[in-house]
Amino acid sequence: MKRMKEIDVKALFAFVADVINIENIPLDDQKTYNLLARADTDGVYMLESDWDKYDLLQIQPKDFDELTACIALSHNPSMNPYIYTYLKIQKVKPFTFPRFSEIDEVRNILKDSHGMLLYKEQAEAIYYHISTMSNEDKKEHAMAIKIITREIEKRKGTLSEHTFFRTRALFCYRNAFIKANLTEVFYSFITSR
């Protein structure tokens, strides 16, 4: 099977337009996540390589945030070494990244990535929150702030763009949804191109 390109996926979306409104599919479809967890992703854009399949088998995304993280970790070379840390965090719950969970708002900012700093937007939100803390709160959490800001500075060049990878994940998810739920239509399209 020939690998899917972005233009092919857009053509697939047009191909199924009479059957389903791809813009309104649920993002919690169990059949789709089962397909992704099995790495049955031939014909699913950005998830067809052996490397991507390996990462899917390891992470086994159960929701959209985990799929976004999986794609960000797989497709950002500077983030890929962190995939094993992410796996440990994902599997060992509750996980407390050193000092990151001491400040409630920081914990909330990182909840979509299981408490791990993955995205530039998370770093920006953390910096913003720290800048709005009272002097008393800054003194109370001084050590946590020091460790958090040091970690952000250390990882600055490796962090991914959350909005970019969320958009990519949505594109991949919709492609996988069609394969999982409209299998005959999917293969009809695949064989016709």
Where are these regions (language model features)?
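Mg2+-dependent phosphoryl-transfer active-site scaffold
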Residues: 1-160, 165-193
